[in-house]
Amino acid sequence: AHDKDSRHRMFNILDVSENINPKKYNLNSDGKLEIEWSEGNHVSHYDISWLRENCYTIKNNEEYKSPYQLWDGSLEKNIHSIYIDHNEIISSEEGLVKWLELLHYKGIAIVYNAPVEKNSAFPVLNRISHTRETFFKTPFEVINIPKPNNSAYTAHALQNHMDLPWFENPPGYQFLHCLVNSAKGGDSSAVDAFAVAEYLKKNDKDTFDTLTKIPLKFRDKDYTQEAHRSFYGTAISLTKDGDYNDVRFSTATMDALDCHPDQMDKVYKSHHKFGKLLHDDKFQIKFR
């Protein structure tokens, strides 16, 4: 029922009725479960290992354990734990795995000893996969320009935020490559938004529920492209297991609140509290 090369299912499950059931079943000589179905004169064979792996009874009875290693401002004292040498990633599989584990479990990694030529980040990025193209083009320079079409292209300090919350599918990972840092300022800050969400979940469930259930509108109005982009999304979105999927937070690109009048007060206060915590030194780290 599957294409031998692509392994995509070739058979149309919609051709089967809702009332199909096994007519006969047994373990065959190869140790596979053999089922003769009540329709279509069809016999299926299942590996026991596949059945065990896809047993929804077992899976959904097991306690889910999040893979994420949430962190707070105390990470700043041990910031070298998220450092990794550029050459280690480029030259070894072990270095690549270490980098991927930092990104997956911690959500952040600082790569040092990187080359400073333009476009020199691509070899290390391509160790993971291809880069995702956006209308900003790839790569794009974050520099101070006259008449900027984005706050990133100004000399103003930026608040903690997630980029492109008005995308239907915001970036999973973003990579910032610092080529020059000789100007005044240039300090960086980072915050584990999942850790802040977890704090609210444990200490202010009403705020947490508001942030996970009531969508906010984000928008981008770019005068250079005659384009208005907008999307509704919750500040915190969850997976089917109740773990964290992503966070949308950006005071610069959040549009006017658009929700039921009865919800307006709690939405405003919940988002305000979330934003305050995302900038609290208890949760964020700073580095240069």
Regions found by a protein language model. Give the residues of each.
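Motif-centric detector for short Cys/His coordination patterns
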Residues: 1-91
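Active-site environment of non-heme Fe oxygenases that use a 2-His-1-carboxylate facial triad
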Residues: 55-57, 61-108, 113-287
